[in-house]
């Protein structure tokens, strides 16, 4: 199943690459300028479902309950006088592991059923998950007044996912790294402060294919981002 999922993701990336090249070719017919955007905000992730080994003879379903934390995003690219843009995006997203359940039960009870934990002792199932994407993006700026504009964008690329269990959870799951394909859709509202600077609000939703790290083979992960941005035109 994962083999066909990888083929599907590669097809998506192939079409997105073709779209990016087409947009860049179109830009060659217009005057364009380099720009950079920095967005600072927070992510709000979905819970991460995974197939977890180490709890019996076969892998069992588990859920990592995630809570979003800070996020910082950087975009560098080229924009033409029609508002079309292409470029590269990277980010640093941090999420906390709030709890872990195995077969619908708290992980402490799951371990107790195997004789590996005292059920009378609270289990500290904490930790952190980080994602660091490198994405190519295409965007379109749509003016709604002389100073305000709506910024639409779509990005795709490769993402590193790192899990760092802490507390008692670190004794069950080791630290692990995995990689995912990521697709992202974005909408923003920008205010042009001057010819060179703009301020804005950004919202995006990212979808990541399931990373594999340590004892967990994760399913797809989604997370929301909302933050404030500052833009610089060179």
Model regions and ranges:
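Surface-exposed strand-loop-strand hairpins of Gram-negative outer-membrane beta-barrel proteins
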Residues: 44-72, 178-179
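Gram-negative (and chloroplast) outer-membrane scaffold detector with strong preference
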Residues: 33, 40-42, 70-167, 191, ...
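Extracellular loop and loop/strand-boundary signature of outer-membrane beta-barrel proteins
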Residues: 57-63, 120-126, 168-175, 211-218
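Predominantly the C-terminal beta-signal and adjacent terminal strand-loop region
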Residues: 49-52, 60-62, 95-98, 110-117, ...
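Hydrophobic alpha-helical segments of small multi-pass membrane proteins
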Residues: 136, 154-158, 179-187, 205
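Conserved binding-pocket/active-site segment within a compact domain
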Residues: 162-182, 186-192, 197-200
């Amino acid at each position: 199943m994962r083999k066909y999922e990888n083929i599907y993701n590669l097809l998506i990336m192939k079409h997105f690459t073709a779209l990016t090249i087409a947009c860049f070719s179109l830009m060659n017919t217009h005057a364009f300028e380099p720009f950079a955007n920095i967005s600072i905000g927070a992510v709000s992730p979905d819970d991460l479902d995974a197939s977890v080994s180490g709890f019996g003879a076969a892998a069992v379903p588990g859920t990592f309950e995630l809570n979003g934390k800070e996020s910082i995003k950087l975009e560098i690219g080229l924009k033409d006088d029609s508002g079309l843009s292409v470029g590269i995006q990277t980010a640093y997203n941090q999420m906390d592991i709030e709890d872990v359940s195995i077969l619908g039960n708290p992980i402490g009870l799951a371990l107790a059923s195997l004789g590996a934990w005292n059920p009378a002792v609270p289990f500290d199932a904490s930790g952190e998950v980080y994602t660091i994407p490198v994405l190519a993006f295409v965007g379109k700026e749509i003016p709604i007044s002389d100073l305000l504009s709506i910024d639409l964008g779509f990005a795709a690329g490769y993402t590193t996912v790192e899990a760092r269990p802490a507390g008692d959870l670190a004794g069950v799951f080791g630290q692990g790294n995995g990689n995912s394909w990521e697709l992202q859709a974005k909408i923003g509202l920008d205010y042009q402060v001057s010819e060179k600077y703009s301020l804005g609000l950004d919202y995006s939703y990212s979808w990541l294919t399931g990373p594999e790290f340590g004892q967990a083979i994760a399913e797809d992960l989604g997370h929301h981002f909302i933050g404030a941005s500052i833009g610089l035109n060179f």
